[in-house]
Amino acid sequence: MSQTGHDMWAEARNLMVDDQLRPSEISNPGILKAMRALPREECVQPAQRAAAYADVSLPLAPGRVLAQPLLTARLAQAANPLPGEHALVVGAATGYSAGVLARLGLVVSALECDEQLAAMGQAFCKANALAVQWSVGPLNTGLPANGPYDLIYFDGCVGAVPDFCQKQLKPGGRLVGLIQKTGDIPEIFRATLTATQEGARYAFAYLSKAQSPLLPGLCPQPQFSL
């Protein structure tokens, strides 16, 4: 008896979790459950679906990718997400990471600058993760209307922490994403906003090296010297 399409994708999701995530110290049961359930193949073009669960990133638009499954899981686990928290996903693309956070019980605002990617993401979340509210606009200003947030999640790489984060993050809130200092390999980071006598500051933790393109508008500014 041949497999149905539903069975085929369900098996692919289970293999992804069991062969890629669990051996790589992804232990949060909510993340594993969400990624066993969410149809990642709906976040890419039909011609890419056969590779949707492979250990690779997949191009979505110039300079934009659907992150490899393990990177998404590592970022979500680094975020220490809690049900009921409010999260902003910056560079939400076609909605997969936003969907994972929503399946973990977070109330998610998804911000995307590319209208076509956002349309795919909205359709994906409407079918699979209703607790996601979408907005289209520049990434470098955040989304103050829905803040402040417990978590700001960059679904990609930044050159530095954007200025908007301190105003839109709650005290004790977290930033998660990849950061690439000039000339360095990107690193997964978590930054917690803490209060000090000198004012609010971030406490940084750098977790592991990874690869992801710089998000539009969040690249480091070029430095010129005479």
Question: What do the PLM-derived regions correspond to, one by one?
Answer:
Residues 80-206:
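Conserved nucleotide-cofactor-binding alpha/beta core module
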Residues 1-90, 96-100, 104, 117-126, ...:
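Class I SAM-dependent transferase core
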